[in-house]
Amino acid sequence: MKISRIAQRLDEAAVSGKATPQLTGDDAVTVREAAEIQRLLIAHRIERGARQVGLKMGFTSRAKMAQMGVSDLIWGRLTSDMWVEEGGEIDLAHYVHPRVEPEICYLLGKRLEGNVTPLEALAAVEAVAPAMEIIDSRYRDFKFSLPDVIADNASSSGFVVGAWHKPETDVSNLGMVMSFDGRAVELGTSAAILGSPIRALVAAARLAAQQGEALEAGSLILAGAATAAVALRPGISVRCEVQNLGSLSFSTTGER
C-alpha cells in the first residue's frame, strides 16, 4: 500500500540521515493521506521503543502560512527519542538538513481536548519553559509541499527544554536571543507565535481532536518558532536566552 510504503521511506530517511525525494508523481498524496503517513511514521519509532510525549505546532507565523498558502497550523508528534538533554550534544551526522529555532514549551497537568478557550487552555497547564526545536526536513534541498511536510512529522526531529516555571508565568511577549558560540544569530519575541503562544496551545487541542486525539496530562506542547530557523553546523554551542525564563543550550558534533 502506498501510504505504508511512503511512511517506511520517510522513517528510513530519518534513521539514516539521508535525503529522500519529495512526494510527487505516483507518490503524491493528499493532506488527509499525509496525516496517516505521519501516524505510521511515528508508529515505526514506537515499535523501536520510543514513546509519544507530546506535540509540536508548525506554521505559527502569518508569514509562514502565507508562504505555504495555508490558513491554519500544522502539527507533528514528539517522541522520547527526540528529547535532547539540556546542555547535551547532538551528532549532526544523524540529520539531513538540521536547523534550530527558539520556542516556548507547555507541560500539561490536565487533559485538554477539542475547542477550548485560552483560559481553559491555561487552566490545563502545569508549567512553562524555554525550549529549542531541531527541525530537519528529510526531503532533498529542504523543499516540500504542504502534504510533504505533514507526512514528514512537520519536520520535527529533536527538542531541548529548559527549566520549568509556574503556569501563571506570562509568556505572551518575551524577548528571545539565540546564539552560536556566543554570537547572536536570531533575535525575536514569543509574541511572534500567533501573537501569544497560548493560541498555539488552543490550536493544538482543536487540531488533535480533528484526528480523534486529545492532549493528555503530562504532554509537552511546543508552541512554535519565535524566529526563523537557523542551519546548524558541527562543533558549535547553541544557546537560547528567554526573558524571565532563563537560558538553555546544547552543542553539536559530527560532520555535514
Curated annotation (Swiss-Prot):
<comment type="similarity">
    <text>Belongs to the hydratase/decarboxylase family.</text>
</comment>
<protein>
    <recommendedName>
        <fullName>4-oxalocrotonate decarboxylase</fullName>
        <ecNumber>4.1.1.77</ecNumber>
    </recommendedName>
</protein>
<keyword id="KW-0058">Aromatic hydrocarbons catabolism</keyword>
<comment type="function">
    <text>Involved in the modified meta-cleavage pathway for the 2-aminophenol catabolism.</text>
</comment>
<keyword id="KW-0464">Manganese</keyword>
<dbReference type="GO" id="GO:0009056">
    <property type="term" value="P:catabolic process"/>
</dbReference>
<dbReference type="InterPro" id="IPR036663">
    <property type="entry name" value="Fumarylacetoacetase_C_sf"/>
</dbReference>
<keyword id="KW-0456">Lyase</keyword>
<dbReference type="GO" id="GO:0005737">
    <property type="term" value="C:cytoplasm"/>
</dbReference>
<comment type="subunit">
    <text>Forms a complex with AmnF.</text>
</comment>
<dbReference type="InterPro" id="IPR050772">
    <property type="entry name" value="Hydratase-Decarb/MhpD_sf"/>
</dbReference>
<keyword id="KW-0460">Magnesium</keyword>
<dbReference type="Pfam" id="PF01557">
    <property type="entry name" value="FAA_hydrolase"/>
</dbReference>
<dbReference type="GO" id="GO:0008684">
    <property type="term" value="F:2-oxopent-4-enoate hydratase activity"/>
</dbReference>
<dbReference type="GO" id="GO:0047437">
    <property type="term" value="F:4-oxalocrotonate decarboxylase activity"/>
</dbReference>
<dbReference type="InterPro" id="IPR011234">
    <property type="entry name" value="Fumarylacetoacetase-like_C"/>
</dbReference>
